[in-house]
Amino acid sequence: ITAIVAEPRLGAYLKPEGEVAEGADMPAYERGDKVVPYRIIDRMKGADLVGIHYDQLMPWVKPTEKLDDYASEQVKAYAAAHPDKVFTGENGKDRFVEMTSAAFVVIPGDYVTTEDGTGIVHTASTFGADDAKVCRDAGVPGLYLVNKQGETRPMVDLLGKYYAIEDLDAHFIDRCVDKAAYGHHAGDYVKNAYDPRFNEGGKWDKEASEKAEDLNIVISLEMKMEGTAYKIEKFTHNYPHCWRTDKPILYYPLDSWFIRDTLDKERMVELNKTINWQPSSTGTGR
């Protein structure tokens, strides 16, 4: 296989004694060998990699954007240049564009370092402000599902499980979903903490859910067997949890309302003074 890694991170994955000189025969590798033979075939700057496309590691769903008043100019331009990728939802009115050829490409990001990992990070525009910004600037589409109401939604629903196929738009399924690959885990909970098996009677059995194998492990092993994961390890790292339930938080791209209250600021301050705050400091200085 051919792999890419930031040079300062090479030693974290491969041992110096495993390097094979140019022109020398590559030794055979057997599962369990302590040393992995490798050869450095080229050295490049990160900027040299920008624009290179790669295969989608989990090709369950093709990247799709909605064509509406909120679509970016880049999405509209892509749709105009690729009319064969545009389709209408089963409701007959909502329009979408499949954008696989604009995705799965190396893009630059100033928040990536060579201090951890490989110096190359996976970027998902629907899960984080940094990711969203660099993807938007580079014209990389999001990875959404389309439900029967014609709405774009993340692959995981608000209950914490992959959307069931029957809840998705039929035209979107035909154009953008590998039903066999996606259906393998459709309906599965991504975190055991949200699985009803560990929440009987409305009470979360934290100990049982943390002991049981969860979907992250299952998918990691599947990728290893398919040859799309080079190495799988367990790492202890910080992860945000809900302060009320102590359950791991799930990230979602959500529809949000933003209220412009500055127009009524003076009236709000005036009304605030009529409230008997206890303690009084609660109603001031904010």
Describe the function of each predicted region:
Residues 1-286:
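Non-cofactor substrate-recognition interfaces
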